[in-house]
């Protein structure tokens, strides 16, 4: 199957700020061999990786972007807050989540597993949309550094071609 990308832009919903400029980028069929996922993203400059599931509540990272790669099975992940999009996510798919974009697992198979990583290995923060975290989070979202490379291709495209116009 050929890799396909889709983009989704989410406006600030009052609770989850989302990113003011960058869309979510979904890569369907990103990797044929998910066993190589960590090696691939690390080689492309994305590290501080972890594997597990996605939290079942809305959260976001204000200080960094994030890549998620579905390693095993499938899930439906909601991006962009309560009014966002519910996107099917299956083994081999990937998504680059801009700083500030909310995400939560709506449903999954019992052994659904993802790999998460961050450009330059940034130590990510965890925000849940509480009013007292918003002002600082909005500032940090705008300051989150652009990654040097696309985590899947290791090149400028497609991620930076989409984000930098």
Curated annotation (Swiss-Prot):
Residues 28-139 form the Cupin type-1 domain. It comes from the Bacteria. SMART domains: Cupin_1. This is Uncharacterized protein YjlB.
């Amino acid at each position: 199957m050929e890799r396909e990308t889709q983009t989704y832009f989410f406006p600030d919903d009052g609770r989850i700020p989302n990113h003011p400029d960058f869309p979510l980028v979904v890569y369907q069929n990103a990797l044929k061999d998910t066993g190589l996922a960590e090696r691939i993203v690390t080689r492309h400059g994305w590290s501080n990786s972890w594997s597990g599931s996605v939290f079942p509540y809305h959260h976001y990272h204000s200080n960094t972007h994030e890549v998620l790669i579905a390693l095993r099975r499938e899930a439906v992940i909601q991006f962009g807050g309560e009014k966002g999009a519910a996107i099917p996510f299956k083994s081999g798919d990937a998504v680059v989540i801009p700083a500030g974009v909310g995400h939560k697992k709506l449903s999954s198979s019992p052994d659904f597993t993802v790999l998460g990583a961050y450009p330059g290995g940034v130590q990510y923060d965890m925000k849940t949309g509480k009013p007292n975290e918003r002002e600082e989070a909005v500032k940090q979202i705008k300051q989150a550094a652009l990654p040097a490379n696309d985590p899947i291709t290791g090149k400028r495209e497609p991620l930076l071609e989409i984000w930098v116009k």
